[in-house]
Regions:
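Membrane-water interface segments at the C-terminal ends of transmembrane alpha-helices
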Residues: 1-29, 38-136, 162-184, 189-191, ...
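Short alpha-helical segment immediately N-terminal to, or the first helix within
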Residues: 33-34, 134-135, 159, 204-205
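Short glycine/proline-centered loop/turn elements that form peptide/ligand docking sites
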Residues: 138-142
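Append "Primarily bacterial transcriptional regulators
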Residues: 145-146
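Glycine/proline-centered hinge or cleavage motifs at structural transition points of membrane proteins
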Residues: 149-150, 163
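Glycine-rich helix-loop "coupling/hinge" segments at transmembrane-helix boundaries
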Residues: 184-212
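Short cytosolic juxtamembrane segments of multi-pass membrane proteins
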Residues: 236-243
Length: 243
């Protein structure tokens, strides 16, 4: 049994623990510590605000889509889920360049609305899939019982469906928020200099600025945020009894 555990454990240590340790060591060097300043904080706040907007839009769009898929027959569910996943098979650069042709006539190209639209399009599947899993598990008899007791469809939705799908909502929000916060390809291609985000700055220090310590410091901030949000999610699951 121990021999079966060793390969995946070695993989995690080699490709996760060791790189993270190297990043942490470089982050606390002199060049790395210089990045913990007001400019970095302002960029983090700006990127967090953009990530929140994208996450909320993905939730607003993704919830009814996931509910519609969950209400379809098994055959149509497979077809619709395939359509949700298909965009992920396309390279992000190719997909983003194709979006330019749609955004330019609207005047959204090289503007923040275009960046948000591109990010929503790219990360919407990561919201739909966990929501679909949660909605599929909601017992229909509970909704019928709520309506039999006099609840309107809207009241039954907010009182029954939403609480039962909180795990999917939380998982979808984390799966969207964290990657958007660290994204750089879509903001750079669709927004230019007006849409520099936290991930763009990390990419700049590693690839253009050739300052691994500065890039490591910013990366460490992203890692810390990821761990904090993941820890908060599991804590909520425990305290609220989410399953």
């Amino acid at each position: 049994m121990k021999r079966l555990v060793f390969p995946p454990l070695a993989w995690l240590v080699l490709f996760l623990v060791v790189p993270t340790a190297i990043v942490a060591v470089q982050a606390f060097s002199l060049d790395g510590l210089k990045q913990f300043n007001g400019d970095t904080l302002r960029l983090l706040v700006k990127s967090t605000w953009i990530s929140l907007q994208v996450t909320v839009l993905c939730l607003v769009i993704g919830y009814p889509v996931a509910a519609f898929i969950a209400g379809c027959s098994p055959r149509w569910r497979r077809v619709l889920l395939l359509l949700v996943v298909v965009p992920l098979w396309t390279n992000v650069i190719v997909r983003t360049y194709s979006q330019i042709f749609l955004l330019r006539p609207l005047g959204w190209y090289l503007a923040m609305p275009g960046v948000i639209a591109g990010l929503v399009h790219g990360y919407l599947p990561f919201m739909i899939l966990p929501l679909y899993v949660s909605l599929e598990k909601v017992p229909r008899r509970l909704l019928e019982a709520a309506q039999d007791l006099g609840a309107s469809p809207a009241r039954a939705f907010w009182s029954v469906t939403v609480p039962l799908t909180l795990p999917g909502i939380a998982a979808g929000c984390i799966l969207v928020f964290i990657p958007v916060l660290g994204s750089f390809a879509v903001p750079e291609l669709l927004g230019g200099r007006e849409a520099v985000m936290f991930g763009s700055q990390v990419n700049y220090w590693f690839m253009t600025g050739r300052n691994a310590a500065a890039g490591s410091a910013l990366t460490l901030i992203l890692v810390a945020l990821t761990l904090a949000l993941t820890g908060l999610y599991y804590r909520l699951r425990k305290t609220e009894g989410l399953v």
